[in-house]
Amino acid sequence: MIAPFAFAAERSLGRRYPEPPHPYRNDFQRDRDRIIHCRAFRRLEDKTQVFTTRYSDHFRNRLTHTIEVAQIARTAGGALGLNTDLCEALALAHDIGHPPFGHSGEKCLDELMRGFGDGFDHNLHALHIVENFEQRYAGFPGLNLTFEVREGIIKHSRDYAAGEAPELSEYLLEKKPPLEAQLIDFVDEIAYNTADLDDGYEAGLLEVAEIRRHVPLFDRMYATAESAWPAALPKLKFNEALKRVLDSLATDLVGHSARTLEQDKIESVEDVRNHPRRLVSFSPPMAEDCATLKRFLYAHLYEHPVLVADREQGSRMLTGLFAIYMSRPECLPPSYRTRAEHEPLHWVVCDYIAGMTDGFLQRQFQELAGLNHKDPKNTKFTKQ
């Protein structure tokens, strides 16, 4: 049983293209399955989270991060009485629009597109993927996901001001998203903050003493772990502390959100949608702990010279490949050249690059940067 304020599958506003019901899967379960089986989801395996895959096979990538978000979302969503199928579908789709090379790749694409008076947003790109770019079905373009999953994709980590983005007006921009979508924003934060600590420590870029000195939440959890396992190896003490950090964040999120729902007398999906603010959140003390952790990661991990150098190299390749395609559109695959006949070239190039994996972009750049003496008609293209 789900709570009255959870979004039941039978209440869905449906799909853009009507389909008959499935005999044993509800609509949100079908959405989950379609996301898992689409090409864009598989490409997340070779998209950077923080560390590029050249460092270790054990560091997170966009795919493993997404799986971790989905796992936490199902658990936290179930504890709150939410629809765990919708939670899972939204979690699996939340990063599907990210370009190669992590957030630096998104920033780079955004800056390139602003040169044409536009911009790049990975949520909007994700919506385009599931509505148009994925081609798996004979009866419709895209994945034909339910309204609620598409709404959750476009509202991930942001609200819209009145009159903003009129092209997205069908997605009830003036209303708050369902609780399941609100939950994903915080679960995403829990997953990447704890995972980045883990990967940073594993890479030797972060030391336990340094983390304890700057992150009170970790310091408290490490002291507890050290008391429980005084003879354990340092790595195992770190693991125990990090496990407790994750559990503390998730437990606080569930507990504080449940209290908010009770205090604000939230009894229906309509109450959620019409509420002036989002209802899922950390408690104020935990929000401050989380903010402190994020500040530490930015100062001591994300700005580490090793990672800065990686980001700069990725941005140079992305910028260079963008310029090549803009000056030589004949280098684009046939389907994108066809689009360029009736769409602005910079958007076609942006969409193509945004869908690439780290490795594919690097290979394309290395091949095409020396194209002066090649005939583009003889260039072999790999679908992305």
Language-model segments: which ranges?
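Conserved short loop/turn motifs at secondary-structure junctions
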Residues: 92-93, 110, 338-339
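Short alpha-helical catalytic segment bearing the HExxH-like zincin motif
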Residues: 87-92, 185
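Histidine-centered, transition-metal-coordinating active-site segments
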Residues: 1-63, 70-76, 84, 105, ...
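Short active-site segment of divalent metal-dependent hydrolases/proteases
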Residues: 93, 97-98, 191
